[in-house]
A protein has these predicted regions:
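Aromatic- and glycine-rich beta-strand/loop motifs that create alpha-glucan
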Residues: 1-21
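Secretory targeting signals
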Residues: 21-29, 122-184, 188, 201-216, ...
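Helix-loop-helix units of permease transmembrane domains in multi-pass membrane transporters
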Residues: 93-125, 302
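Long, hydrophobic alpha-helical segments
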Residues: 72-98, 102
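Hydrophobic/aromatic residues in alpha-helical transmembrane segments
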Residues: 86-90, 134, 175, 294, ...
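Short alpha-helical transmembrane interface motifs in multi-pass membrane proteins
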Residues: 71-75, 84-88, 157-161, 279, ...
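Terminal transmembrane helical anchor/hairpin motif
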Residues: 26-66, 152, 198-301, 305-308
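Selective transmembrane-helix segments that form parts of the transport pathway or gating/packing helices
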Residues: 10-14, 78-81, 113-140
Length: 309
């Protein structure tokens, strides 16, 4: 069965290796120049606190040069890439057998349908995990200089580093395997599996992820003009009747004095950097659990359903 499965999926394997090679080439070209600029601009010294007054300008110049390239290149495929990759691999696993009738040969041998599917799933799922881990490693290396400045929690870093990218691909793959079994067509199965995967992906990111752990709170009290006015906003207000308090001042008014008198300050809600792997583990666990449910359902349905006509 190993040789048969290799012959069936070697085209996908070669295509995935080609995709990985393309990502690696792009990463090497862009990241090499990024790393050179990072070192030549003296940013390691800035991060160590010994770069002097030139650091803000140097950091801004670096992010202006490479930040947009990093962000645009990955943001354009951030949401759909793992899902597309997973469904393209998963949908034909059973759907193609049912669509072209090759199940008649595959399932008439001495190997049971359940064992046939279990072996295919073990091999292909293992390949999916290896592919996801390899892409994650390449992108993590590629983004390393920018991550030292921005951290790992921004979306286009968080979603491609750590554990979640592999979990995203695995979940989409599992959905596509199940849907391919149900509707018996590869291309429609890709579409039908991708839509719920994307919906879950968005819900987890924007609804659940911010609440995996309660954020820490940092309050910056006004102690100087810099800390006070740095958080004060300017704008227009409509006519006000009655007493005007310290919350609104003329452009030439003593804003700092008013803020100090009112004991005002800035409150920051944040997730510390050392929670990155905790967040990654929670989110990856959600998608791996969904993948396990989908694959378990596919095995159960294939075992119980009658042979297709």
């Amino acid at each position: 069965m190993l040789w048969v499965n290799w012959r069936q999926h070697r085209g996908q394997a070669i295509a995935c290796l080609g995709l990985l090679a393309a990502i690696a080439i792009y990463a090497i070209v862009v990241s090499t120049s990024m790393r050179t600029a990072f070192s030549n601009d003296g940013l390691p010294a800035c991060l160590a606190g010994s770069g002097g007054t030139r650091c803000p300008t140097a950091i801004q110049a670096f992010t202006n040069e490479f930040g947009s390239e990093v962000n645009v290149a990955f943001w354009s495929v951030l949401l759909i890439f793992p899902g597309l990759l997973g469904v393209v691999i998963g949908a034909p696993l059973i759907g193609r057998e049912l669509e072209f009738g090759t199940w008649r040969l595959a399932w008439s041998q001495s190997v049971t349908r359940t064992r046939w599917l279990a072996v295919k799933l073990a091999l292909v799922t293992g390949g999916v995990i290896v592919l996801g881990a390899a892409i994650t490693a390449v992108i993590t290396w590629y983004r390393a200089p920018m991550d030292r400045l921005t951290g790992h929690f921004i979306n286009n870093a968080y979603d491609f580093e750590g554990l979640v990218l592999t979990a995203y691909i695995l979940c989409a793959f599992a959905f596509a395997v199940l849907v391919g079994l149900l509707i018996r067509r590869s291309i429609p199965a890709m579409i039908a599996a991708f839509v719920p995967w994307l919906a879950i992906r968005l819900v987890v990111e924007y609804v659940f992820r911010p609440h995996f752990l309660a954020p820490l709170v940092f309050v910056q009290r006004c102690s100087s003009p810099q800390t006070c006015m740095g958080g004060a906003g300017l704008g227009f207000i409509p006519p006000v009747t009655g007493h005007i308090g310290d919350w609104v001042l003329g452009m030439g008014g003593p804003g700092t004095v008013a803020l100090l008198r009112g004991h005002l300050g800035n409150t920051w809600l944040y997730q510390p950097a050392d929670r990155f792997w905790t967040f990654q583990s929670i989110e990856a666990g959600i998608f791996v659990a969904l993948a396990a449910i989908a694959l378990g359902a596919a095995i159960w349905l294939l075992h119980r359903r009658p042979r297709p006509a």
